[in-house]
Structure formats: structure tokens, C-alpha cells
């Protein structure tokens, strides 16, 4: 994944900040969306428009806990397969995280650059669209996303935790969590999924057929690999393989980033009332939309 020293150094700093941060003081709001004070700053957001994207940048957009670390690994392995050079992250890969000087430093980084983000489409720097960078948009069903988000907060040492699943569910539905409401993110991206430089990826599809998903990603990025190469990357990118190496690649948070990776884990926590509330929210926000169909909500969130 990321260059160990740089990635883990950033995570360690964020965890250190979290130690003395109460949950009620974890967020600051920028342009109507809450962000964690341990990872983002208003100064960085103000500098974000100075970021100069390149046509060969690879942008990975997702709501938190939807598989961005998984896709980061896959794309890194694809780059290695075609270039024979191990991809290294000179900066923490999430575009909006870090200090406000990072965008100047990134000008000197070699291409292609992999850029992760949890931002809405209309919050991204305009140069990404002007220079026609490739954008992979990763989605996961909202129920499993919520459960994974809770476990990340409550399992990782030093990160402020929630008193109960019920408490977290209320905050998740209100958007009082890092990067705001899942459904706001979804509505915003729904309008842009059919763009020429945009590729939609469903977490559940990757779980069902990882090799096929990797092949689609490779073709979208213009990487032409043999079946043997695709299979090799697939074996290296299973949840089990990534979890086994997570301490080395992600430091202290590694085992918590790769906790279960199961489809349907929400059934262990959701009450009937919570199910109904989420189902109604889905209908209100995404029923009849392109993204609503792509999420296969009936298959993964009902029954």
C-alpha cells in the first residue's frame, strides 16, 4: 500500500490527536459538511483549489468505509504489473487530508499519482475535470457501510467511540459523522456516474468476483494485462491476504481497517425499525436513479 514510514507517520499523528479529543469535539464543519479535526483543516480545504491535477492522475472517490483501501491496493498492484515499479505514496493518499502545503509538494511527484478522496463531486478541485483525470467511484451498500463505520470508531484504540450502535445509527442518519451523510454523498455523485472518465465500482461485485472486477478496473485505466497477471493480483488482493499484511502496510489501524469485509454484516445489528428507516431513506434519495439501480439495494439490504 502506502510508503510505510509516511503513511504510518500520518496515522500515528492522527491517533495521537484523537487521544485527547472527545467525540463531541471531533468534527469541524466546512461548507456544511463535518470533517475530523484529527485529519483535516480548514486551511487545507482553502488550499485545495490550488491542486493541479494531471490527465494521468487516478482518483478514487468513495464515502468512508466503502473499500477505498482495497481499491488503493488493487490500483497500486496494477501499476506495478505494467511498470515493474512498486508504487509509493510520498503523501497520505487522501487528497483532503494533511497540511495545506501538500499540494505544492505533490507537483514534484512522478506520474501516475493515485489520489483517494471522500469528497462530493462538486467539492473536488476543478483541475481534475479540466484535465480529464480518470475517476473510480466506489460504493458499498449503506447498511454494511454504517456497521463498518461504527466498528472503526469503537475498535481502534484512541479514536473517540460511541456508547452504542443505536447512538451511532442516529448520528449516521443525521450526517453527524466524518464526511457527513452517506445519502448526500450518493445523491451528489449519482449525477456524474456516466461521465467518460468515470468508472463505477460496487464493493459487493468485487466480493463476488474479484478477478472480473480487477480486469474491468485495468481496462478502464488503459492497462492491458494477461489473465495470469490478473489472477496474481486477485490472489494478492483478497481480504484475507490484505488483512494478513495490514500491520505492515497500515500500522496500528491495519487490523481494524480490514476487520471482516463481509456482505450482510448489518443483519447482526440493525433493528426492524432501523431497517425501515434506512429503507425509507433509500427510497427517498435514490429510488429510480441510476445509482439506486447500481447499488442492488434489494439484493444486499433487504430480506
Swiss-Prot record:
3'-phosphoadenylyl sulfate binds at residues 65-70, 140, 148, 203, 237-242, 259-261. GO terms for biological process: sulfation. InterPro entries: P-loop_NTPase, Sulfotransferase_dom. One of its GO terms (molecular function) is sulfotransferase activity. It catalyses: thyroxine + 3'-phosphoadenylyl sulfate = thyroxine sulfate + adenosine 3',5'-bisphosphate + H(+). The active site is at residue 118. It is found in: Cytoplasm, Cytosol. Its main location: cytoplasm. The keyword Kinase does not apply. Belongs to the sulfotransferase 1 family. This is Sulfotransferase 6B1.
Amino acid at each position: 500500500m502506502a510508503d510505510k514510514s509516511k503513511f504510518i507517520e500520518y496515522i500515528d499523528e492522527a491517533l495521537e490527536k484523537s487521544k485527547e479529543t472527545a467525540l463531541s469535539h471531533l468534527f469541524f464543519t466546512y461548507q456544511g459538511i463535518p470533517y475530523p479535526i484529527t485529519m483535516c483543516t480548514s486551511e487545507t480545504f482553502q488550499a485545495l483549489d490550488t491542486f493541479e491535477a494531471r490527465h494521468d492522475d487516478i482518483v478514487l472517490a468513495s464515502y468512508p468505509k466503502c473499500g477505498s483501501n482495497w481499491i488503493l491496493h488493487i490500483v497500486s498492484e496494477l501499476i506495478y504489473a505494467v511498470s515493474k515499479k512498486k508504487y509509493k505514496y510520498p503523501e497520505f493518499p487522501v487528497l483532503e487530508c494533511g497540511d495545506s502545503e501538500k499540494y505544492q509538494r505533490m507537483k514534484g511527484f512522478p506520474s501516475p499519482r493515485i489520489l483517494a478522496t471522500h469528497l462530493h463531486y462538486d467539492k473536488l478541485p476543478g483541475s481534475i475535470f479540466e484535465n480529464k483525470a480518470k475517476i473510480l467511484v466506489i460504493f458499498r451498500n449503506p447498511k454494511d457501510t454504517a456497521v463498518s463505520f461504527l466498528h472503526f470508531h469503537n475498535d481502534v484504540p484512541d479514536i473517540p467511540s460511541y456508547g452504542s450502535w443505536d447512538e451511532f445509527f442516529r448520528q449516521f442518519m443525521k450526517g453527524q459523522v466524518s464526511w457527513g451523510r452517506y445519502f448526500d454523498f450518493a445523491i451528489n455523485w449519482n449525477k456524474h456516474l456516466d461521465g467518460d472518465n468515470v468508472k463505477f465500482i460496487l464493493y459487493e461485485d468485487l466480493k463476488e468476483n474479484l478477478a472480473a472486477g480487477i480486469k474491468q478496473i485495468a481496462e478502464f485505466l488503459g492497462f492491458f494485462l494477461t489473465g495470469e497477471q490478473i489472477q496474481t493480483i486477485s490472489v494478492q488482493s483478497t481480504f484475507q491476504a490484505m488483512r494478513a499484511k495490514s500491520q505492515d502496510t497500515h500500522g496500528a489501524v491495519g487490523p481494524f481497517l480490514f476487520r471482516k469485509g463481509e456482505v450482510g454484516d448489518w443483519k447482526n445489528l440493525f433493528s426492524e425499525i432501523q431497517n425501515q428507516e434506512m429503507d425509507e431513506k433509500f427510497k427517498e434519495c435514490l429510488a429510480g436513479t441510476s445509482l439506486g439501480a447500481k447499488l442492488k439495494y434489494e439484493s444486499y439490504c433487504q430480506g
